[in-house]
Curated annotation (Swiss-Prot):
<dbReference type="InterPro" id="IPR011050">
    <property type="entry name" value="Pectin_lyase_fold/virulence"/>
</dbReference>
<dbReference type="Pfam" id="PF13229">
    <property type="entry name" value="Beta_helix"/>
</dbReference>
<keyword id="KW-0963">Cytoplasm</keyword>
<feature type="repeat" description="PbH1 1">
    <location>
        <begin position="480"/>
        <end position="502"/>
    </location>
</feature>
<dbReference type="GO" id="GO:2000177">
    <property type="term" value="P:regulation of neural precursor cell proliferation"/>
</dbReference>
<dbReference type="GO" id="GO:0005819">
    <property type="term" value="C:spindle"/>
</dbReference>
<keyword id="KW-0175">Coiled coil</keyword>
<dbReference type="GO" id="GO:0008543">
    <property type="term" value="P:fibroblast growth factor receptor signaling pathway"/>
</dbReference>
<feature type="repeat" description="PbH1 3">
    <location>
        <begin position="532"/>
        <end position="554"/>
    </location>
</feature>
<comment type="function">
    <text>May play a role in signaling pathways governing cellular proliferation.</text>
</comment>
<dbReference type="InterPro" id="IPR012334">
    <property type="entry name" value="Pectin_lyas_fold"/>
</dbReference>
<dbReference type="InterPro" id="IPR006626">
    <property type="entry name" value="PbH1"/>
</dbReference>
<dbReference type="Pfam" id="PF23762">
    <property type="entry name" value="SHCBP_N"/>
</dbReference>
<protein>
    <recommendedName>
        <fullName>SHC SH2 domain-binding protein 1 homolog A</fullName>
    </recommendedName>
</protein>
<dbReference type="InterPro" id="IPR039448">
    <property type="entry name" value="Beta_helix"/>
</dbReference>
<keyword id="KW-0206">Cytoskeleton</keyword>
<dbReference type="InterPro" id="IPR045140">
    <property type="entry name" value="SHCBP1-like"/>
</dbReference>
């Protein structure tokens, strides 16, 4: 306290607080500001006063054995930091031909021109240099070797004289992209390090050699920089399918190679004497036109992937995995192979596995067994008819499990013991396209994914006693695909737990679907009129979902209004049409509660027999009312879903037949029954769903 009183003496009467010790207070306030706002300290320099975008979090130690000084760590910038710098300060609204000019202007304001050390980094060597000047127009730094001489070669030893000779040849000029700023605690060179990082990142990740030859009427940042920057960070965050990333890299390499060949050919043609080699020039010009056409095609493909909307519409489905790999079919030499997946296995586990699973399959003495450490590796090695047995353990999968052949995947043990965890966000977890695929006793886990957990593109897939911990969408059953899901548990989807497309067949028996946005989403499109869904739901428990237990997505009445008017103009509605219209317009569906009423009658008779005992009567009545309420709720939920979907499909079928009749096409007037849509819908329980049992979404 004594020290505090000495440092801050009490105010006297008449003193002004803001004038007491003003010099000392100003110094202390500056110290506080410097501590609290270190990154905003201008350091009395015009270069430092330029707006600071991004941050230098810490120093980093250079790789290698040479004792180089620490460097600024600038490679961990966020998307918005780079975005704001390129948009507002480096590029602005420049045209492709003005890019270099705008960058030079930015560097003049943000860069210290001299007095700082750096490491000149190349593929062959690293050497410590001192920057004496910067040529902004050419984006070069004028350097000299630091003392003492520090150099590390990645190939062989390089002497001091060799580096000096190289600098003499380069006239002491080094590209700014190749230098890394040495860390300085004073903060004077923070913005210098950041500016060079922005420059290096731009030319490594954003700029393309052919950009300056593009049309000069568009905004370069909007057309090229923003989509490429977003794509780069989407790839870093694993939000792009791995197949699409590989395709983009391949296209980029092809485009660079063709552009280099085209540029060399164009330079050769411009240097030749047109009179002496006219015939050869004509051949070269034709070849150049072919290269130019190939370049344009490659650039269009690159732009298709770089644009987020076009990438989602045209590229995601192509790279979902189902189209990239062909089914292998039966093994060329015949036979069946059992693939055993295990990271490690005890003798006891091996004995149990042999006794319980391998010996029953060993009717064929030539049966082959292959061992793998990764489920993805095992699936990729499968041919039609193979069996994959996954031993207990946690398996991390980097990539898409693409099942194209009819195989069986079985977890050896309980699902919670056999866990396959998806690493990465961009790929679908499992894609099924085989004629008959069976997966049992396996738990699939997603984290921060942007694609669904299982997608069935075609064929029949069985899920038996599986656990699906979803992230976005759960199981998707595409057109012409079939799913049989039994005794499985699905939860955690931010979208629908299941998506059922028109033309698919889905059988759900004894499953739990819970803690999703919606339980089951049934899609119904106006242009798919003959694709009658086949859905079986028995003894499922759909509960604790945020929205509805079951949602039907169908066109709004406005979309079908013209078709309905045509139907009215063609004549009066028949009885079936009137019934459908009434069901659709009223949207009041009366469930069949005969069984529930039967329960009520029995309950009344039972209570009449207990009239003598008033206490027992009250208890029995309460129990019966509870039982009746539960039965009514379950019966109503099942009946509402069945009735609404039958009515919707009947309506679509009638509209379709009316359209055909106007074209003179007559079809058999087969009555649509509920059995054509639902093989069975009984015993399902719908509990604690946020919006109720059944909902309709109109688009």
């Amino acid at each position: 306290m004594a020290e505090a009183e000495a440092q801050f003496p009490p105010l006297q009467d008449g003193d002004d607080f803001f004038h007491v010790g003003s010099d000392r207070c100003s110094e202390e306030l500056r110290d506080v500001k410097q501590v609290l706002f270190q990154e905003e300290d201008d350091s009395a320099s015009d270069y430092g006063s330029y707006k600071r975008l991004g941050k230098v979090t810490s120093r980093t130690v250079p790789a290698g054995n040479m004792l180089f000084p620490d460097l600024f760590q600038t490679n961990n910038l966020l998307f918005y930091e780079r975005f704001e710098t390129y948009k507002d300060y480096m590029l602005g609204d420049c045209k492709p031909s003005e890019v270099k000019e705008f960058i030079a202007e930015y560097l003049e304001k943000a860069l210290k021109p001299s007095g700082w050390n750096a490491i000149w980094h190349t593929d062959v060597f690293d050497v410590l240099v001192e920057v004496t000047d910067v040529e902004f127009s050419s984006l070069n730094a004028i350097v000299r070797l630091s003392e003492p001489f520090l150099c590390e070669s990645h190939v062989s030893s390089i002497a001091l004289e060799s580096i000096k000779d190289l600098l003499d040849v380069k006239d002491q000029r080094v590209p700014l992209q190749e230098i890394r700023v040495v860390f300085d605690e004073s903060g004077l060179y923070n913005q210098t390090a950041l500016a060079i990082e922005h420059l290096r990142f731009f030319y490594q990740q954003i700029w393309r050699p052919w950009d300056e030859e593009e049309e000069d009427y568009f905004d370069y940042f909007v057309r090229c920089v923003e989509p490429r920057l977003r794509l780069h960070y989407d790839i870093l965050e694993d939000r792009i399918p791995s197949g699409l990333v590989a395709e983009y890299s391949s296209l980029l390499l092809q485009c660079e190679e063709v552009y280099m060949q085209f540029t060399n050919l164009r330079n050769n043609l411009s240097n030749k004497d047109s009179d002496s080699e006219s015939e050869l020039d004509n051949v070269s010009m034709v070849e150049g036109m072919k290269m130019d056409n190939e370049m344009e095609n490659l650039k269009r493909k690159l732009k298709l992937i770089e644009n987020p909307l076009l990438r989602y519409l045209f590229c995601y489905q192509r790279n979902s995995g189902c189209h990239n790999v062909q089914a292998k079919g039966p093994r060329p030499n015949g036979g069946k192979v059992i693939h055993v997946v295990s990271t490690s296995m005890s003798i006891l586990t091996l004995q149990c596995l042999t006794r319980e699973r391998l010996q029953p399959e060993s009717g064929n003495k030539d049966l082959e067994i292959q061992f793998h450490r990764d489920p993805l590796e095992a699936v990729n090695a499968c041919y039609e008819g193979d069996l994959v047995i996954i031993c207990p353990g946690l398996y991390a999968v980097y990539g898409l499990i693409n099942i194209m052949d009819s195989i069986e995947i079985e977890g050896y043990g309980l699902p919670d013991d056999v866990v396959i965890e998806k690493m990465g966000k961009g790929d679908t977890f499992v894609a099924c396209s085989g004629a008959h695929i069976k997966i049992s006793n396996v738990k699939f886990v997603q984290h921060e994914a942007v694609e669904g957990i299982i997608t069935i593109h075609s064929g029949k897939t069985e899920l038996d006693n599986c656990v699906l911990q979803c992230e976005t969408t759960g199981v998707t059953v595409k057109k012409s695909a079939e799913l049989l899901m039994k005794y499985s548990d699905l939860y955690g989807a931010k979208g629908a737990g299941m998506e059922i497309y028109p033309g698919s067949k889905c059988t759900l028996i004894g499953n739990g679907i819970h803690h999703c946005r919606d339980g089951i989403l049934i899609k119904d499109f106006i242009d798919v009129v003959c694709e009658i869904p086949k859905i079986t739901m028995e003894n499922n428990v759909i509960h604790n979902n945020e929205g509805y237990a079951v949602v039907l997505v169908k066109p709004s009445l406005d979309i079908e209004k013209n078709s309905h008017n045509e139907e009215l103009e063609g004549g009066h509605l028949d009885d079936d049409d009137k019934m459908i219209e009434e069901q659709t317009s009223s949207n009041i569906l009366q469930p069949n509660l005969n069984k529930a009423m039967g329960v009520e009658d029995k309950a009344v008779e039972h209570t009449n027999n207990l009239e003598k005992d008033q206490g027992n009567l009250a208890i029995a009545k309460e129990e019966v009312e509870c039982e009746y309420a539960i039965d009514c709720e379950e019966a109503e939920g099942n009946q509402v879903i069945a009735t609404e979907l039958v009515a919707n499909t009947r309506r679509k079928t009638k509209l379709h037949k009316k359209r055909l009749s106007t074209l003179g096409i007559v079809t058999a007037d087969d009555k649509l029954t509920s059995q054509e849509i639902f093989v069975s819908i009984v015993g399902n329980q719908f509990k604690r769903n946020g919006k109720g049992t059944f909902g309709t979404f109109l688009f």
